[in-house]
């Protein structure tokens, strides 16, 4: 039996396992939008924590983060440190209030929550929905690109075929049971993701001759790879780290992740959910960095004659028996699908609930919206010429800058008028885009920092003008 047949057999075996979980979850579903979009707010903290981990740690961790670390070395650790701290702060100050407010207002989407109590004006929910579909759709496309790259590296498939396979699997998950199927499969996929990453890490370090030998070889390849401080930072290390901390806090602008807080069975269980998520986050992120550094030692030619974003699957092929390569590929694809299905469900919710609120309670139209969004995402993935890291990172910053500030203020029950809300969303995204594309400063300070600051400043200015009018 050829290696490719063995790899494909194990890969398909795990896909069937995930599909079986999704199909079983469908037996627990109810045919209404509340169950399709929020699982009737009945998910226990263990499932929620595992699902949040799998959704947040997408194919980007297997592909883009490893590819980036492969290029820059140990200094990439600050991206993950800052991201974790910001994310953890958000869990303390935003997730629990979001769970409480979403139930108080009986809202099923982020857009509906943002627009709650504003009668006769749907501008906030419509603009937030458009932002979600555009940028979260692009983010979902980045996941499909990651899946396409993995299948290309292992089987030699055309990128487009791998992308289409990923899209078909995502649609099947979404149609089987909505967010309940997504969460249940996330839980199983998170175990496969963690196991595959840790297994490859251990084998790679042993092959390098141990941590000490790996570190010495990295220094010989390029001394900057073992320099913990990034070079050429225009604004210094402090602002660089702060920008990535704010990037982590930018999770509050990611509907597909924040909805995990909304599905939790009780706000009282948020602390347990947060701790499960955080422990898995730290272990998995550290393992990903270790795998990337080992890959730079074992397959150094990807910088000149390959794609650094393919470091993980390429190293798996070189180091592991065919069956284990199938497991690694399943772990990578798990990360892709667990995020993409959540993103597509959030986009379809924005389309069916916020842009066309007259269809809000139609279960069939919610499913049709899912299919429509998947086709759009597939088109973006097939026509994009960006690498996954660039596409995913800018989509995250746009969502964090556009939706983050207004969501924070909403769950803290601050009054926001339609004009101010729309200005905050558009202003934040514009500033982030200018910082990235026009000024070219994202390498020194990630654009989500100025983008989110702009959103909060716009709100602050609106309060000053309101006080002046009262005076």
Question: What are the residue ranges of the model-derived segments?
Answer:
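Membrane-embedded helix-loop-helix hairpins and adjacent transmembrane boundary segments
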Residues: 1-471
């Amino acid at each position: 039996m050829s290696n490719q047949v063995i790899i494909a057999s194990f890969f398909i075996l795990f896909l069937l396992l995930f599909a079986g979980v999704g199909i079983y979850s469908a037996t627990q579903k109810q045919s209404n939008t509340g169950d399709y979009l929020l699982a009737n707010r009945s998910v226990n903290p263990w499932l929620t924590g595992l699902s949040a981990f799998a959704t947040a740690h997408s194919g980007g961790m297997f592909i883009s983060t490893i590819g980036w670390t492969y290029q820059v070395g140990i200094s990439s650790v600050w991206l993950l440190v800052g991201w974790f701290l910001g994310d953890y702060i958000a869990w303390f100050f935003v997730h629990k209030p979001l769970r409480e407010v979403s139930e108080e207002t009986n809202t099923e989407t982020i857009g509906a929550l943002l627009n709650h109590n504003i009668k006769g004006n749907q501008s906030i929910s419509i603009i937030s929905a458009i932002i979600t579909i555009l940028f979260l759709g692009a983010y979902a496309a980045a996941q499909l690109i990651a899946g396409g790259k993995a299948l290309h590296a292992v089987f030699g498939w055309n990128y487009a075929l791998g992308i289409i396979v990923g899209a078909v699997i995502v649609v099947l998950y979404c149609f089987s049971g909505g967010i309940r199927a997504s969460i249940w499969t996330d839980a199983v996929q998170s175990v496969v993701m963690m196991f595959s990453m840790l297994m490859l890490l251990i084998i790679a370090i042993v092959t390098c001759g141990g941590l000490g030998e790996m570190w010495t070889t990295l220094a010989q390849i390029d001394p900057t790879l073992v320099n913990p401080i990034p070079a050429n930072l225009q604004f210094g290390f402090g602002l660089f780290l702060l920008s990535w901390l704010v990037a982590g806090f930018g999770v509050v602008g990611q509907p597909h992740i924040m909805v995990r807080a909304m599905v939790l069975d009780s706000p009282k269980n948020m602390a347990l959910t947060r701790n499960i998520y955080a422990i898995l986050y730290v272990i998995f992120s550290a393992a990903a960095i270790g795998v990337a550094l080992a890959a730079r030692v074992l397959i150094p030619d990807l910088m000149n004659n390959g794609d650094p974003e393919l470091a993980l699957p390429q190293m798996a092929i070189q180091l592991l028996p065919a069956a284990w390569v199938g497991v690694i590929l399943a772990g990578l694809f798990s990360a892709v699908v667990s995020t993409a299905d959540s993103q597509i469900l959030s986009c379809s919710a924005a389309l069916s609930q916020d842009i066309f609120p007259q269809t809000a309670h139609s279960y069939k139209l919610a499913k049709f919206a899912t299919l429509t969004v998947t086709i759009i995402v597939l088109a973006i993935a097939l026509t994009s010429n960006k690498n996954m890291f660039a596409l995913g990172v800018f989509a995250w910053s746009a969502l964090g800058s556009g939706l983050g500030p207004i969501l924070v203020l909403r769950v803290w029950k601050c009054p926001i008028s339609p004009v101010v809300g729309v200005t905050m969303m558009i202003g934040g995204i514009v500033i982030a885009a200018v910082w990235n594309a026009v000024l070219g400063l994202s390498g020194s300070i990630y654009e989500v920092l100025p983008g989110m600051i702009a959103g909060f400043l716009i709100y602050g200015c609106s309060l000053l003008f309101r006080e002046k009018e009262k005076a």
